């Protein structure tokens, strides 16, 4: 797995296996399709070192925005780019906004931008 790490973004080669996609569809009682559901991209976040610093945090997802220009296919390698867009302290919570973008042959496939909050204890 090839990856690049900068302060606020990271790139990895990623793919979705047939078995993992079939299991995802099974969870929702849907027939299997070779098209990867857009929200399955959430399974990629933990693969990025940039996101691992939040692994033991109690983050609450508050917003998801999806911009998909192409279908995501099973067993196809994409370049995943995770970017830390914003970290803002608002009273007793911290709000994090991150974007995961998949490209294939330098063509945009999907961007999933998600906002999380973490309450300070």
Curated annotation (Swiss-Prot):
InterPro entries reported for this sequence: UCP032370_VraC
Highest taxon of the lineage: Bacteria
Protein name: Protein VraC
Gene label: vraC
């Amino acid at each position: 797995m090839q990856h690049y790490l900068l302060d606020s973004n990271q790139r990895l080669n990623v793919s979705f296996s047939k078995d993992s996609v079939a299991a995802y569809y099974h969870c929702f009682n849907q027939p299997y399709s070779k098209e990867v559901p857009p929200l399955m991209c959430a399974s990629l976040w933990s693969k990025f070192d940039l996101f691992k610093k939040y692994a033991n945090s109690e983050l609450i997802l508050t917003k998801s925005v999806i911009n998909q220009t192409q279908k995501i296919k099973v067993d196809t390698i994409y370049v995943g780019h995770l970017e830390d867009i914003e970290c803002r302290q608002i009273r007793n919570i911290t709000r994090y906004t991150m974007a995961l973008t998949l490209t294939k042959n330098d063509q945009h496939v999907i961007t999933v931008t998600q906002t999380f909050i973490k309450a300070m204890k």
